[in-house]
């Protein structure tokens, strides 16, 4: 109870700071340029979803047969995490679906508050609904922060090995970190034996300037089928941090290349 009270006060403070810093009124058009702008908009418009997402009439194309499921991180929501990447993916021809989960705190816009196993159960239900609506056999999942770890739990323990083609994760806390605690006991169980599941393609995209997952190497997987990408190894001048990575042009291009490696596009720094 005490921890939740502290989290509640933190959530309210964070919400107020976001609105004060961005100054976006409730009547503004949806922001897609930065996390801070999108957070403020999502607080003023509870339940808003990112552009290009959650069209349950979408029919997957032959080029992109797997719908893309976007999974936000801790104290985030589908809009503030994916207001830039979601329309990019939709414009590229993907059926895009963005989950909001774990919205149990005093500010609905700040989600992913439940445990990794509970969050993975919500993701499982959401994926089932996407598969039922689209007729697809599998999905690809893109997650940020905790939203990159939750799909791994789903894949290993809740049947996701049968429904997930690939997992692309941005700055996920895959191993214990000096930053905010992420259920180290769950991570130990999740990583035991192998930190990947056979048959799933993994791409883990990280930044050396991550101030939440510390050290940033706690994101990196070692199992078969995974590709680790450090942004600064690709573009040394890139300085994006943890929260901004889902808005970073380089990271977004790497996500799209990971989703469709046969048609990957050149990288521009």
Residue ranges and their predicted role:
Residues 73-77, 108-115, 178, 239-245:
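Second-shell loop/turn segments in exported
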Residues 198-269:
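C-terminal catalytic-base region of ester-bond hydrolases, centering on the histidine
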Residues 90-106:
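Conserved alpha/beta-hydrolase
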Residues 2-92, 268:
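Flexible, membrane-associating and regulatory peripheral segments of lipid-active enzymes
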């Amino acid at each position: 109870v005490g921890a939740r009270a502290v989290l509640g006060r933190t959530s309210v403070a964070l919400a107020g700071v976001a609105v004060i810093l961005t100054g976006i009124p409730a009547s503004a058009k949806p922001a897609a340029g930065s996390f801070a702008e999108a957070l403020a908009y999502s607080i003023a418009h509870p339940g808003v979803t990112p552009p290009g997402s959650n069209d349950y009439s979408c029919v997957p194309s032959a080029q992109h047969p797997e719908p893309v499921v976007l999974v936000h991180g801790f104290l985030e929501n589908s809009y503030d995490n994916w207001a830039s990447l979601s329309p990019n993916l939709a414009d590229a021809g993907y059926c895009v679906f963005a989950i909001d989960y774990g919205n149990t705190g005093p500010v609905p816009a700040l989600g992913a508050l439940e445990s990794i196993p509970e969050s993975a159960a919500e993701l499982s239900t959401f994926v089932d609904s996407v598969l039922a609506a689209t007729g697809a056999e599998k999905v690809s999942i893109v997650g940020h922060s905790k939203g990159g770890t939750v799909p791994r739990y789903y894949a290993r323990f809740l049947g996701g090995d049968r429904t997930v083609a690939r997992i692309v994760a941005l700055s996920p806390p895959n191993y214990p970190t000096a930053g905010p605690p992420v259920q180290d006991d769950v991570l130990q169980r999740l990583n035991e034996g192998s930190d990947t599941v056979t048959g799933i393609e993994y791409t883990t995209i990280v930044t050396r300037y991550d101030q939440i997952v510390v050290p940033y190497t706690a994101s990196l997987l070692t199992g078969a089928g995974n590709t680790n990408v450090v942004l600064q190894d690709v573009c040394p001048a890139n300085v994006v941090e943890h929260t901004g990575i889902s808005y970073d042009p380089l990271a977004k291009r790497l996500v799209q290349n990971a989703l469709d490696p046969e048609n990957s596009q050149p990288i521009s720094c």
